[in-house]
């Protein structure tokens, strides 16, 4: 590798061609980047004290024999700034040409020195060759032609920006500023330097690369040019097209995170860690096999998450799940989609699984069960699925989920859906649409209707409403206003919302004439009071069980899926000498009661040398000692929030118990504080830092 400080203009001088590899992202600098460059050029050009201005690096590697008449260099880093200064040079050339100026430099000199190779034929005539949609627009500009409308928007708009700036600028200042631009010129040697490692280490200015950019470059950069082109055209470009331009920018990183969750089993990959995780994962696979897998799962993701599914039943199910905003289930659904494509399940079985997932997420939301465990649940769910008993094993998996991860049963769901504030429920349009269109052949456009409170929202109800509700009207209004029994859809104007129930029922377009399923029965109702609201709420709640059903299996079948307890020696408190009395026993009894009360999912297990408390797995282990208890918290030391500094980092130290945080409990007055530390370990295991 050869690196040197160099004037930017010297980089472009001489017969050569800089080529942007096909896998590199297209030109993406925005006007703000161009404005900054322009301001720097003018500032340094006007200054008699500033002799240079550093704009970053240019890293390139030979594509062909460097001794060729016109050597070709593949740009590894610096595409954005080289392209942008080239646009500035074209704008400068055009003004010099238009005004027939020879000072401070002639248009012919700009073209010969920096833009064209005089003796190059065809594309070899251009000093810089961009990729894909950027390629022709830059060539047209160098040729003095107007780019077509189908060309790169950024190339054209940024050229126009520089043309406008140069039109009113002092050309002497501009040219002096351009000549003072400096770069770090890094020329790599083919077969010796690793362009990917160098690319990653560059601390470049400009627009940050996304995780997707880094992954694409990592996969394709080390290949020969012919393979780069084939793999890009056969695999990566189809993925970009499948996503679409905007979704590729906004969604690809998230897709890659879910892809890695599926294939690595690591459910805690954060968006900023996707690239590093991918590099570690990719080393096990040939490039083409890896790209083929990415392309396959791109198809699944786009159908599930981006509405690209063509089959009607699946499209409707995916739409419902998207409207629930249950993105965390996508890893599971992509795996199920793969099984469907491989004919391990039939179409109706696939739909059954999708509706179970939908019901699981919606029932939990209605029952206000914290969402924090969902990411872990869905990321690991497919490990227990038996491909020869697919739907049965999915049902069993949902039915065996414990406490905070449970699938709410019918009793809990019916009870909660009647009392929830469904008007302020953040999936309001979803549940209204699902209620109205369940088992309908012709879908009702729910978005054309407005949500209606049958008993009005007005806290100061009129005399008729007070009479209908009775003496206890204030309590009834407060208790039932936003609940299932009092909410419906209407097409009439909201100005009628305070009218009496009889008027709403009998008016033109009122409840009696409503074609909506949600309004069935309201036309025959004589009075709207607490009894009527409760009855309607009960009826709709029973209907909800049919819309969002819970899985069901005979007990003998479900029992076969339950894990068999391991055989071996069992221990009790009597096997721990330090727990037979004294302070350690007193501390332990107080501690265990409060730990078990943290959540109903917490289990206690006596082992030979310590007592384990676990939800999914151990989150705190208690080692009884003569003077108290030694606790091992299943956290990495940097994760613990310990204002009093009681914890000790035991990373890489041999000990009994799990985790890298140790704390001693030797005084009863410390129990509440230490329970706060223990809760952190439990919350991490339950995924309380994750949201749907």
What is the predicted function of each stretch?
Residues 605-661:
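Short, conserved beta-strand/beta-arch hydrophobic-aromatic motifs that form part
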Residues 653-692:
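Well-ordered alpha/beta subsegment
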Residues 582-601:
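Amphipathic alpha-helical segments
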Residues 68, 76-81, 175-178, 187-194, ...:
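Secondary-structure capping and boundary motifs in well-ordered enzyme cores
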Residues 2-267, 507-515, 519-533, 539-558:
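Glycine- and hydrophobic-rich flexible loops that cap the catalytic core of alpha/beta enzyme folds
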Residues 43-71, 105, 382-522, 526:
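Betabetaalpha-Me/HNH-type nuclease active-site subdomain
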Residues 212-215, 220-431, 524, 528:
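A cross-family structural signal marking well-folded subdomains
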Residues 16-20, 565-581:
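A short, surface-exposed helix-loop junction/capping segment
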């Amino acid at each position: 590798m050869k690196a040197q400080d160099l004037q930017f203009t010297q980089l472009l001088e001489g017969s050569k061609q800089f080529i942007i590899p096909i896998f590199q992202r297209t030109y993406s600098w925005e006007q703000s980047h161009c404005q900054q460059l322009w301001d720097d050029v003018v500032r340094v050009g006007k200054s008699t004290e500033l002799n240079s201005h550093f704009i970053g690096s240019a890293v390139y590697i030979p594509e062909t024999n460097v001794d060729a008449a016109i050597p070709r260099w593949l740009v590894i880093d610096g595409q954005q700034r080289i392209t942008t200064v080239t646009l500035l040079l074209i704008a400068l050339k055009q003004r010099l040409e238009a005004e027939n100026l020879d000072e401070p430099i002639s248009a012919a000199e700009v073209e010969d020195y920096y833009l064209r190779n005089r003796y190059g034929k065809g594309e070899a005539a251009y000093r810089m060759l961009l990729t894909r949609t950027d390629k022709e627009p830059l060539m047209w500009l160098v040729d003095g032609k107007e780019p077509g409308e189908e060309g790169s928007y950024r190339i054209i708009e940024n050229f126009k920006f520089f043309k406008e700036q140069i039109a009113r600028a002092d050309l002497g200042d501009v040219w002096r500023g351009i000549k003072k631009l400096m770069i770090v010129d890094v020329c790599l040697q083919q077969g010796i330097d690793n362009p990917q490692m160098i690319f990653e280490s560059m601390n470049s200015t400009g627009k940050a690369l996304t995780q997707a950019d880094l992954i694409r470059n990592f996969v394709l950069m080390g290949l020969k040019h012919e393979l780069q082109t084939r793999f890009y055209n056969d695999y990566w470009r189809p993925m970009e097209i499948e996503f679409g331009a905007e979704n590729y920018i906004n969604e690809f990183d998230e897709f890659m995170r879910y892809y890695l969750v599926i294939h690595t089993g690591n459910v805690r990959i954060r968006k900023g860690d996707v690239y590093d995780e991918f590099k570690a994962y990719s080393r096990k696979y040939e490039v083409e096999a890896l790209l083929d897998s990415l392309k396959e799962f791109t198809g699944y993701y786009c159908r599930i998450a981006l509405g690209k599914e063509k089959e009607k039943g699946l499209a409707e199910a995916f739409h419902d799940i998207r409207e629930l905003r249950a993105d965390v289930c996508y890893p599971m659904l992509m795996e199920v989609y793969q099984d469907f494509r491989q004919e391990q399940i039939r179409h109706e079985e696939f739909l059954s699984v999708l509706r179970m997932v939908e019901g699981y997420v919606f029932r939990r939301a209605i029952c206000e069960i914290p969402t924090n465990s969902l990411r872990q649940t869905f990321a690991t769910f497919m490990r227990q699925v038996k491909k020869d008993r697919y739907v049965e094993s999915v049902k069993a998996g949902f039915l065996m989920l414990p406490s905070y991860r449970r699938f709410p049963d019918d009793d809990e769901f019916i009870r909660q859906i009647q009392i929830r504030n469904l008007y302020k429920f953040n999936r309001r349009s979803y549940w209204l649409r699902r209620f109205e269109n369940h088992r309908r052949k012709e879908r009702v456009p729910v978005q054309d209707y407005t949500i209606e409170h049958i008993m009005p929202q007005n806290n100061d109800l009129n005399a008729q409403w007070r009479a209908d509700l009775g003496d206890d009207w204030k309590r009834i209004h407060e208790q039932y206003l936003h609940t299932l029994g009092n909410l419906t859809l209407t097409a009439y104007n909201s100005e009628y919302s305070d009218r009496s129930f009889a008027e709403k029922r009998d008016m033109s377009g009122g409840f009696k004439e409503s074609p909506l399923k949600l309004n069935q029965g309201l036309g025959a109702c004589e009075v709207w009071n607490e009894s009527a609201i409760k009855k309607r709420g009960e009826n709709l709640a029973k209907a909800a069980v049919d819309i969002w059903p819970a899985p069901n299996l005979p007990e003998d079948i479900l029992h076969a899926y339950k894990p068999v307890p391991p055989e071996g020696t069992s221990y009790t408190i009597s096997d721990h000498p330090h727990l037979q009395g004294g302070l350690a026993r007193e501390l332990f009894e107080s501690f265990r009661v409060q730990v078990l009360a943290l959540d109903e999912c917490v289990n206690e297990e006596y082992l030979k040398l310590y007592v384990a408390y676990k939800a999914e797995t151990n989150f705190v282990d208690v080692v009884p000692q003569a003077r108290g208890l030694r606790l091992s918290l299943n956290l990495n030391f940097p994760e613990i929030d310990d204002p009093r500094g009681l914890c000790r980092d035991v990373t890489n130290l041999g000990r009994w118990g799990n985790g890298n945080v140790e704390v001693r409990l030797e005084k009863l007055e410390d129990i509440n504080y230490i329970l706060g530390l223990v809760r952190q370990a439990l919350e991490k295991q339950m995924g309380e830092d994750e949201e749907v």
